[in-house]
């Protein structure tokens, strides 16, 4: 039986991803909104929580099933490759071609460079190989019982936290980001948080003092977000470096929440399909509205978000009718 609170968080997380993509990560993408528009400020908040929350939920779901080495590493990798890498290749190829052929889209690629989308991070699909690598790392650590107690988990999480902070600096800055391994390093601590919130829920959440400390540190994240917005430059870079320190307790508290909402639970049940296909809706929605002569920001934001959310749900239902299409584009048997 599904945990409705976590499914609610999953629905919220994927909606944040969609809205963030509609707005765009910078003035040159998405709706091409420049500073200091309020939607740019909104994106700073979305960017803070969207992927860490998505990753923590993935870790929580992984930990639901007790680890068993008897199933074998090969079997585990095949299942995760089917679920993550096959759709990455299929949907990524389709997205590349549509973006290349359709007028009015952002960041068109060259056909001669299409091979790169299977080897290096490509637009929103960077996350899928990153998550695949994270699953492989987690399986390997579990096979050696490195995370079967809170103490061992804390050591592993600290190591992951250090790796995430040195990610893309020093020597790593010069290393090609093959298979989105840098994204995996950046998201690894949050996956570990999800694992711990499932495996060690009683010692984590049973003490009020622990929860109070978590809340206090999590609230400091609000101050970091304001620094990133109001003091761009070195102060913002330092604040972003500290993001995981405030994000980790925030994620623990969110995963422990008991609130649920039927609408978000429903959206959450299609989260993976929405992630795979929402890029078509965000781009297509903006283009269609502009062709209709609609340039107002709010109608474009709401309409593109609606299309990018509901469209993939319809695509999911359509593809699910064919075994081959279901496997290629949704990663389901």
Which residues does each predicted region cover?
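Membrane-cytosol interface segments of multi-pass membrane proteins
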Residues: 1-163, 291-333
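Juxtamembrane "helix-exit" motif on the non-cytosolic side of transmembrane helices
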Residues: 27-31, 100-105, 166-175, 224-234, ...
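Interfacial loop-to-helix transition and helix-capping segments at the boundaries
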Residues: 39-51, 115-129, 168-190, 224-250, ...
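Hydrophobic transmembrane alpha-helices
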Residues: 60-64, 134-143, 187-203, 247-261, ...
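Aromatic-enriched alpha-helical transmembrane segments of multi-pass intramembrane proteins
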Residues: 117-118, 141-235
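Alpha-helical transmembrane segments and terminal signal-anchor/GPI-anchor hydrophobic tails
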Residues: 185, 203-265, 283, 288, ...
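Hydrophobic, well-ordered secondary-structure elements that form the walls
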Residues: 267, 278, 319
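Hydrophobic alpha-helical membrane segments
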Residues: 270-283
